[in-house]
Amino acid sequence: MSLLNCENSCGSSQSESDCCVAMASSCSAVTKDDSVGGTASTGNLSSSFMEEIQGYDVEFDPPLESKYECPICLMALREAVQTPCGHRFCKACIIKSIRDAGHKCPVDNEILLENQLFPDNFAKREILSLMVKCPNEGCLHKMELRHLEDHQAHCEFALMDCPQCQRPFQKFHINIHILKDCPRRQVSCDNCAASMAFEDKEIHDQNCPLANVICEYCNTILIREQMPNHYDLDCPTAPIPCTFSTFGCHEKMQRNHLARHLQENTQSHMRMLAQAVHSLSVIPDSGYISEVRNFQETIHQLEGRLVRQDHQIRELTAKMETQSMYVSELKRTIRTLEDKVAEIEAQQCNGIYIWKIGNFGMHLKCQEEEKPVVIHSPGFYTGKPGYKLCMRLHLQLPTAQRCANYISLFVHTMQGEYDSHLPWPFQGTIRLTILDQSEAPVRQNHEEIMDAKPELLAFQRPTIPRNPKGFGYVTFMHLEALRQRTFIKDDTLLVRCEVSTRFDMGSLRREGFQPRSTDAGV
């Protein structure tokens, strides 16, 4: 740890009985691939799962001998077990039979309990060594039963669902299907380059705004989005109404015949226009006149109300501006009072100040993420009158040279109320302590003592609110040591600063501390 003047930075087969056949029909089938792995047998499955599956439903070559056939499910024995009466069953089948049909053997009705069953490992090894055919259609491979599962995992004839249309296809065909045959494969429009599923392309082509279409009237080829404008304005053969349709002419003609129609029907169009004008100039009856007067009165009333509301709005706006200025003045007064209260509180410290740093876990996380963490304490006085000081805590980054993962702790002088009445530069002793917050009778605080060096700028009278130059320890305490005891409690770190403007070496020795040698100021 170094003390530095810091500037800003720092069995046998038997025929099945009627009872056995009935049990076979009642045993539930499971449509799930049987686990037959090469080195990992079905014995690795959980007991609850094993009780729900039957024998191996595969084709054996040569055909399965009857001695390896379960009398209940009539398939090859899976997890073969033997009864005291010498019969073999699938483990799951016989357990289900005992629980559903009673404690008896399905073949000879002898009394049979679950704890009387014992594994037939010989039969199990024999069955797993039998040759079987791959169940996938088209695959001609044969292998031992124990290798069937591994083969099926890589068999090119195994079925798998297309990720786009969800239909099943054999593995060797799935890529061709996805690229060329799948109705949900992605294609793009030749006209607008939009992407869509192949099965949706036909509908898109019928509505694509950039597709070429032929005008049904003049056979002009245009893109679809231009066609409505073409019909309304440009198509020479599109049917349109007469210009005088609003006045009573109901004729329709091609656009290129409109001029001839207007020329040939000028007189009739004029008569229609005259009748329309005449109907508009007819004097309305008294009922309409009274209604118009009522509307005028209503408008006049609304205008008066609008003027009054406008005046009210202006008055309210002026009041609001006055209130806003008053609130701003109150806020300034509150800030001034808060500053005065803080100043008074700082003066009550009498040189001993305990700084509570909350949310310290957040600061440690920022340090681990290599984000700079620099925290300043509120100001405090060494007495009344006295010097005004503050502390600065800096969590050094993991990449910092010579001080990585250390807590740096410094003291800064501040402009205070009594600066003009105090001797400068500051002289005295500063004791910095990180408090142990454990409940132990004897607490092990981490404490360092330093003497002020009057020749350093850090102890000169500050010319700005806070002296940018500080004095303290770059390597005050390692973060690993911080975690070894209860220095952090309720996510809060307590830092104590005791300042004495008189240096009493005798009192320091009596308390068991020796002043540390200080490094040259930087």
From Swiss-Prot:
Glycyl lysine isopeptide (Lys-Gly) (interchain with G-Cter in ubiquitin), cross-linked positions = K124, K319
Described function: E3 ubiquitin ligase that, together with UBE2N and UBE2V1, mediates the synthesis of 'Lys-63'-linked-polyubiquitin chains conjugated to proteins, such as ECSIT, IKBKG, IRAK1, AKT1 and AKT2. Also mediates ubiquitination of free/unanchored polyubiquitin chain that leads to MAP3K7 activation. Leads to the activation of NF-kappa-B and JUN. Seems to also play a role in dendritic cells (DCs) maturation and/or activation. Represses c-Myb-mediated transactivation, in B-lymphocytes.
Ranges where the record places region Interaction with TAX1BP1? 1-354
Q: Which GO terms describe its biological process?
A: activation of protein kinase activity; antigen processing and presentation of exogenous peptide antigen via MHC class II; antiviral innate immune response; autophagosome assembly; bone resorption; canonical NF-kappaB signal transduction; CD40 signaling pathway; cellular response to cytokine stimulus
Using the UniProt record, give the first listed, main subcellular location: cytoplasm
Q: What class of enzyme is it?
A: transferase
Q: In which tissues is it expressed?
A: Expressed in heart, brain, placenta, lung, liver, skeletal muscle, kidney and pancreas.
Q: What EC number(s) does the entry state? A: 2.3.2.27
Domain (MATH) spans 350-499
Q: What PTMs does it carry?
A: Sumoylated on Lys-124, Lys-142 and Lys-453 with SUMO1. Polyubiquitinated on Lys-124 by TRAF3IP2; after cell stimulation with IL17A. Polyubiquitinated on Lys-124; after cell stimulation with IL1B or TGFB. This ligand-induced cell stimulation leads to dimerization/oligomerization of TRAF6 molecules, followed by auto-ubiquitination which involves UBE2N and UBE2V1 and leads to TRAF6 activation. This 'Lys-63' site-specific poly-ubiquitination appears to be associated with the activation of signaling molecules. Endogenous autoubiquitination occurs only for the cytoplasmic form.
- Write down the species: Homo sapiens (Human)
Q: Which domain of life is it from?
A: Eukaryota
Q: Which UniProt keywords apply?
A: Coiled coil, Cytoplasm, DNA damage, Immunity, Isopeptide bond, Lipid droplet, Metal-binding, Nucleus, Osteogenesis, Repeat, Transferase, Ubl conjugation, Ubl conjugation pathway, Zinc, Zinc-finger
Recorded catalytic reaction(s): these are: S-ubiquitinyl-[E2 ubiquitin-conjugating enzyme]-L-cysteine + [acceptor protein]-L-lysine = [E2 ubiquitin-conjugating enzyme]-L-cysteine + N(6)-ubiquitinyl-[acceptor protein]-L-lysine
Q: Gene for this protein?
A: TRAF6
Q: Identify this protein by name.
A: TNF receptor-associated factor 6
Please state what the annotation says regarding this protein's domains. The coiled coil domain mediates homo- and hetero-oligomerization. The MATH/TRAF domain binds to receptor cytoplasmic domains.
**Which InterPro entries does the record associate with it?**
MATH/TRAF_dom, TNF_rcpt-assoc_TRAF_met, TRAF-like, TRAF1-6_MATH_dom, TRAF6_MATH, TRAF6_RING-HC, TRAF6_Z2, Znf_RING
RING-type zinc-finger residues = 70-109
- Molecular function per GO: histone deacetylase binding; identical protein binding; protein kinase B binding; protein-macromolecule adaptor activity; signaling adaptor activity; tumor necrosis factor receptor binding; ubiquitin conjugating enzyme binding; ubiquitin protein ligase activity
